Amino acid sequence: MKYTLTLARTNQDDDSVYPEQDQKPVADPLDKQIEKNVYFGKLKNLLHKAVNWGRSNSLWPYNFGLSCCYVEMTTAFTAVHDVARFGSEVLRSSPRQSDFMVIAGTPFLKMVPIIQRLYDQMLEPKWVISMGSCANSGGMYDIYSVVQGVDKFLPVDIYIPGCPPRPEAYIQALLLLKKSINKERRPLSWVIDDQGVYKMNMKSERELKRKDRISAVEFSDTD
């Protein structure tokens, strides 16, 4: 029997399609419009807020999982956690009907072309959440068959640490994604506004809550 080994895209031409995380802070594009035309600038600001409000409160996840972190993700959809409070309870079985994809589990090398194809089938705007240590950095699988991080072949918006993360961590990631979407600036159409995507420069929650972690001296049982 003949076997075919499918490798990840490593050519230089493919790097432009799925670049690694390369973000740089830029100024809000609405500031220039407000200076040129105060009325039109305020109108665009209201339109962006209305569109972002609708997108952030109706996030449909793609029903996709790779490993044990997927079990923790589906636990968040039970009545105990009630993820429907955030408008993200509608699991979609097709990437064309979903808003974001959660890479929950170990990204094996053979799965990379499949994940990339599913990501390409998603309609804009779309987002990616990396859930678990294996998806973030390969975890404990530092071997030839596991990609050391999803951001090697997909743009990632939110990282969830843990092995595996708790369902509460997934809910916190949804809240962070909602916060990021509310700060985004996307073109309203192909003739109006700049044809570029401006995203929020999010800082690590570990650094933001560093003082709170250091000041904690007593720990209680999570249960």
UniProtKB/Swiss-Prot annotation:
Region (Disordered): 1-25
GO cellular component: plasma membrane; respiratory chain complex I
EC numbers: 7.1.1.-
Main location: membrane
Catalytic activity, reaction form: a quinone + NADH + 5 H(+)(in) = a quinol + NAD(+) + 4 H(+)(out)
UniProt: [4Fe-4S] cluster binding residues: 68-69, 134, 163
Protein name as catalogued: NADH-quinone oxidoreductase subunit B
